[in-house]
Amino acid sequence: MSGPSRTQRPMSPLRAFFHHETSAGLVLMACALAAIAVANSPLAPGYFATLHAYAGPLSVQHWVNDGLMAVFFLLVGLEIKREILTGQLATWGKRTLPGVAAVGGMAIPGIVYVMLNLNNPDALRGWAIPAATDIAFALGVMSLLGSRVPSSLKIFLAALAIIDDLGAVIIIAIFYTANINVATLLGAVFVFGILRSLCAANFQDLRIYLALGAVLWVLLLVSGVHATLAGVLLALTIPITTASATPDPSRQTAPLHRLESLLHAPVAFAILPIFGFANAGVSFASITPAIMTDTLAVGVAAGLLIGKVVGIFGAVALMVRLRLAELPTHATWLQVLGVAFLCGIGFTMSLFIGLLAFEDPHMQDRVKYGILAGSLLAGVLGYGILRIAGRRAL
């Protein structure tokens, strides 16, 4: 039997990806509902006190949002790198349709939000909140439909969401970075340079990469750049090829694939559920009918529910009409519409951007109302449309 190729990866990575993402979506959904229930129960004071309690230099909530989510962004970065180099986004032809759809699905929600908040300057900083898609939630809902949805549509949704994640990372880096400490930022650049050099030399020891990644995280945290970006930067430096010759069987799989395989379960079943439980809790005790006219909450909900659909479905329709792309194999227009609605589930990344955009707890709560309402409606409508479309296809 011939030895492993230099780009060998674990068996069925796409199947493993869908398995983890769909299961993670269901677990995340349960934790989000649990957080809402606790926040509206007699346990609420203890819940919020625990989140705001300090453990060392950061509060518990900050450790979750800045620390654990850096690991989530590391996994996101690994998935983006893998898909661009060897996967569903490896050629421009494969990138075109989900790429254009992702751009439309980020731009139009932002425009919808801004239009509704033109007279509310304080709220404009949240323009990017409805631009995000939660791939775990979206694939989790899609998994409930089983064989009613063609696999090509699942791949399209995954590719679209991965590009969407890349866009969200860029937005966070550019628009949601605080005052910069130049000295520590230069230190972070130096560490990143070391990581790039190790990658260029195809250095295989993940322990060294992770140790330097931890140093990079600390430097970015102190510098004012959001520390979670350390995860993405580290991912860019993890080699995707194996050493030309290694007697160690554990090293016959590329470091990127080893690390991605190692992180999938902890991120899916620990980090994302913890994030959801720590951030989805919002009290409805003070909610009034006035929330229906609150442009911040309505802007987020409308961006997710209307902006995503118009942006994604419109972009796909334009590309197909201009004969620049074709619909995913065996997919119908009604199914594409259903996927566009599912992309309006913006939970994890939308919450994350909302917390970066606003420090005022009251504004954060209004953002959460909008995210919950928009994501719930988008998920229900997307599921319903795909279920109807699946019956027609049978």
Swiss-Prot record:
Gene Ontology MF term list: sodium:proton antiporter activity
Subcellular location: Cell inner membrane
Function: Na(+)/H(+) antiporter that extrudes sodium in exchange for external protons.
Keyword tags: Antiport, Cell inner membrane, Cell membrane, Ion transport, Membrane, Sodium, Sodium transport, Transmembrane, Transmembrane helix, Transport
Annotated TM spans: 24-44, 58-78, 96-116, 126-146, 155-175, 180-200, 214-234, 267-287, 300-320, 336-356, 370-390
Chain coiled-coil ranges: none
InterPro entries the UniProt entry points to: Na/H_antiporter_dom_sf, NhaA
Protein name: Na(+)/H(+) antiporter NhaA
Catalytic activity, reaction form: Na(+)(in) + 2 H(+)(out) = Na(+)(out) + 2 H(+)(in)
GO cellular component, one term: plasma membrane
Biological process terms in GO annotation: regulation of pH
Species in which this protein is naturally found: Azorhizobium caulinodans (strain ATCC 43989 / DSM 5975 / JCM 20966 / LMG 6465 / NBRC 14845 / NCIMB 13405 / ORS 571)
Membrane-topology annotation of the record: Multi-pass membrane protein
UniProt keyword Transmembrane present: yes
Major place of residence: membrane
Protein family membership: Belongs to the NhaA Na(+)/H(+) (TC 2.A.33) antiporter family.
Gene: nhaA
